[in-house]
């Protein structure tokens, strides 16, 4: 055993060493916590980016250039937001892969809430990708939103509502910014439900070891 008494931050080390999880938990179980860390990073940096962003098709790109060049530490916020978004998806795909490998899909409520989270996350990332309103943003907005027209009966109406008219324009960007801002809070709510369901069901135990260390 390790003696923590003569070490700095002994209380924190003791707390971490007594984390009540079973011996079957490995590094692959860390990615859920890493996803929460990514989410918090995105919300904090996103808030500061939103302060300086202008949701207008003529000013959006200029506002991002201004953010990068003129706002103190703006380039750090922008790059952290972009890199953390990529890390978010790396973590979530590893998180899903671990769930598939160890049969976590057998816990239906946890798995379905997680699947819903993935869909919302992908939608959030798409809306964020469009916000700079560069050439690729316009192309992505046009192509992806046109997929809604494939929905029977409601498709055309949904697309027109999302565009705010009959073509991609200023109202579209305003809607995308509003949705990109509100979706992370929906993700927080869904994550809380996901965690509550997980604690109700319990995690998978691939080694079949006794996880009761009390």
UniProtKB/Swiss-Prot annotation:
Tell me which InterPro entries the record gives: Cyt_b/b6_N (IPR005797), Cytb/b6-like_sf (IPR027387), Cytochrome_b_N_euk/bac (IPR048259), Di-haem_cyt_TM (IPR016174)
Protein name, as recorded: Cytochrome b
Q: Where in the cell is it found?
A: Mitochondrion inner membrane
Q: What else is known?
A: Heme 1 (or BL or b562) is low-potential and absorbs at about 562 nm, and heme 2 (or BH or b566) is high-potential and absorbs at about 566 nm.
The record's listing under CDD domains reads: Cytochrome_b_N
A Gene Ontology biological process annotation? mitochondrial electron transport, ubiquinol to cytochrome c
Q: Which is a Pfam family this sequence falls into?
A: Cytochrome_B
Taxonomic source organism: Bothrops bilineatus (Green jararaca)
The cross-references to PROSITE patterns, in alphabetical order and at most eight, read: CYTB_NTER
Which residues does the annotation say bind heme b b566?
Answer: 95, 194
Matching entries from Gene3D superfamilies are given as: Cytochrome Bc1 Complex, Chain C
Q: Which residues cross the membrane?
A: 31-51, 75-96, 111-131, 176-196
**One term under GO cellular component:** mitochondrial inner membrane
Tell me how the cofactor is bound. Answer: Binds 2 heme b groups non-covalently.
Query: What function is annotated for this protein?
Result: Component of the ubiquinol-cytochrome c reductase complex (complex III or cytochrome b-c1 complex) that is part of the mitochondrial respiratory chain. The b-c1 complex mediates electron transfer from ubiquinol to cytochrome c. Contributes to the generation of a proton gradient across the mitochondrial membrane that is then used for ATP synthesis.
Q: Which residues bind heme b b562?
A: 81, 180
Q: How does it sit in the membrane?
A: Multi-pass membrane protein
> Is-annotated flag, keyword Flavoprotein?
no
What is an example of a GO molecular function annotated in this UniProt entry?
Answer: ubiquinol-cytochrome-c reductase activity
């Amino acid at each position: 055993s390790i003696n923590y008494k003569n070490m700095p931050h002994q209380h924190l080390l003791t707390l971490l060493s007594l984390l009540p999880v079973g011996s079957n938990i490995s590094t692959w179980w860390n990615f859920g916590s890493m996803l929460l860390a990514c989410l918090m990073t995105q919300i904090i940096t996103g808030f500061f980016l939103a302060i300086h962003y202008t949701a207008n098709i003529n000013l959006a790109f200029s506002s991002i250039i201004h953010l990068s060049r003129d706002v103190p530490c703006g380039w750090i916020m922008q790059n952290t937001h972009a890199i953390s978004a990529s890390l978010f998806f790396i973590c979530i795909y590893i998180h899903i892969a671990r769930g598939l490998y160890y049969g976590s899909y057998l816990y239906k409520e946890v798995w379905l809430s997680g699947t819903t989270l993935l869909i919302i996350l992908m939608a959030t990332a798409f809306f964020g990708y469009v916000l700079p309103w560069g050439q690729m943003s316009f192309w992505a907005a046009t192509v992806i939103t046109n997929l809604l027209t494939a929905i029977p009966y409601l498709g055309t109406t949904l697309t027109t509502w999302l565009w705010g008219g009959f073509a991609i324009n200023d109202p579209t960007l305003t809607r995308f910014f509003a949705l990109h801002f509100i979706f992370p809070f929906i993700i927080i709510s869904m994550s809380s439900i996901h965690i509550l369901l997980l604690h109700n069901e319990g995690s998978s135990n691939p080694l079949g070891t006794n996880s009761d260390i009390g």
